[in-house]
Regions:
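Conserved MFS/SLC helix-loop-helix module at the cytosolic interface between two early adjacent transmembrane helices
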Residues: 59-95, 271
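Helix-breaking motifs and short loop linkers at transmembrane-helix boundaries and internal kinks
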Residues: 40, 72, 93-99, 127, ...
């Protein structure tokens, strides 16, 4: 940990970039009820707001990878933070669902240049024994951003409306982009080899297992982020304050479990950590469907946040050990594309299931089954080299 913190600019710049990404991506979910009412959306269209983002995010993976290879992770990450912030500001001017989905698509397309270049930056500055911890510290930014959004956006919406609150978030994101550019730094010997499809080990079963696992991991994560606030209000009758508290608990768990997952992976191995994380997630999702209220509900929200964030860093830090450091960037980019596709599909499907069945239960059972599948597939992945 001490050696990781010897590079504070890299850690802080990456932290801020991921925090801003999370704020811009999830701010609308905290006022989704207001958006849904004003734009007259059903649950399927409400789910399309998250899916529209990840259509753009998926399409942006390869172009941003090329930009990062050619101009460096620093410029790519700062430019991406700027792009998603401007798109969020424009989302606040949406007058119909077509405009709203278009701006969400643009947010995803322009925001796709933060995470994978960040992984590349971590790989260049930290050795194999430090990467999991470093990436875990960076990803605390994601959970911190969601906590901030879950409190600030609903409070601002009372006086500014949902539109004004999202516009203000966009302006603050533009400032964040400049700060990220100041603190981040590319390493001189950073590998600048461009994306080469020959680097992708399509003949390796473990590559495909990891791709499916990433589809499930991020899809499940954003299903909770997109729908949890509305579920807590509709199914549990929580107030805005109580819902914000619950979402803060979900994301506070991520602040703790992101670095914990990275450190556990450095010590016990990514494979064991990922198997434990996915099986735990399945169990907690099933318990969530029981409709338990009171303190138990808040405990379950914490455990869901813990288990789903515990797998994030190991899911990427395992890649160099399996496929080599030189191909880690290309493999991470492809894996992240699968992850983005999962985040595109699963939130939309849950909204469709809710419209069709008038209940969230079947959707939650499906996410639990996919979590079980991810744990089983992880058992088939080869052991990474030390």
């Amino acid at each position: 940990m001490r050696r990781v913190l010897e590079k504070p600019g890299i850690i802080f710049g990456g932290f801020l970039g991921l925090a801003t990404l999370s704020i811009m991506n999830t701010a609308y979910t905290n006022v989704l009820d207001d958006i849904k009412s004003e734009l007259i959306l059903n649950y399927t269209w409400a789910g399309a707001l998250m899916s529209g983002y990840f259509v753009g995010y998926t399409l942006g993976q390869i172009p941003w990878g090329i930009i990062s290879d050619r101009y460096g992770s620093r410029k790519a990450m700062a430019l991406s933070v700027l792009g998603i912030s401007l798109s969020t500001l424009l989302f606040g001017y949406s007058s119909n669902i077509v405009m709203a989905v278009a701006f969400r698509f643009l947010s995803g397309l322009l925001g796709a240049g933060i995470f994978v270049p960040g992984v590349k930056l971590v790989s260049s500055w930290f050795n194999s024994e430090e990467r999991g911890t470093a990436l875990g510290l960076l990803t605390i930014g994601g959970s911190s951003g969601m906590i901030l959004a879950s409190w600030v956006v609903p409070v601002l919406s009372v006086s500014l409306s949902w539109r004004g609150s999202l516009r203000l978030m966009g302006v603050l994101g533009i400032i964040s982009a400049m700060i990220c550019f100041y603190f981040l730094k590319d390493r001189n010997q950073q590998n600048t080899r461009q994306l080469n499809f020959k680097d992708i080990p399509i003949q390796e079963p473990s590559f495909w297992y990891l791709s499916i696992i990433q589809f499930i991991r991020l899809g499940a994560y954003y299903t909770f982020i997109a729908w949890m606030p509305l579920v807590l209000k509709e199914e549990y009758g929580l107030s805005i304050l109580a819902t914000s508290s619950a979402m803060s608990i979900l994301n506070f768990a991520g602040i703790l479990s992101n670095p914990a997952g990275g450190m556990a992976a450095d010590r016990f191995g990514e494979k064991r950590v990922l198997i434990a994380g996915f099986f735990s997630l399945m169990l907690f999702i099933l318990l969530f469907t029981f409709g338990l209220g009171g303190p138990v509900l808040y405990l379950l929200v914490f455990l869901l946040g813990w288990s789903i964030n515990f797998t994030r860093s190991p899911a990427f830090s395992i890649i160099p050990g399996l496929f080599g450091t030189e191909t880690a960037g290309s493999v991470s980019g492809v894996n992240n594309t699968f992850a983005s596709f999962g985040a595109l599909v699963l939130p939309f499907v849950l909204g469709y299931v809710r419209d069709t069945t008038q209940s969230y239960v079947i959707g939650w059972y499906s996410v639990a089954a996919l979590s079980l599948l991810a744990g089983l597939l992880m058992g088939l992945v080869s052991e990474p080299e030390l």
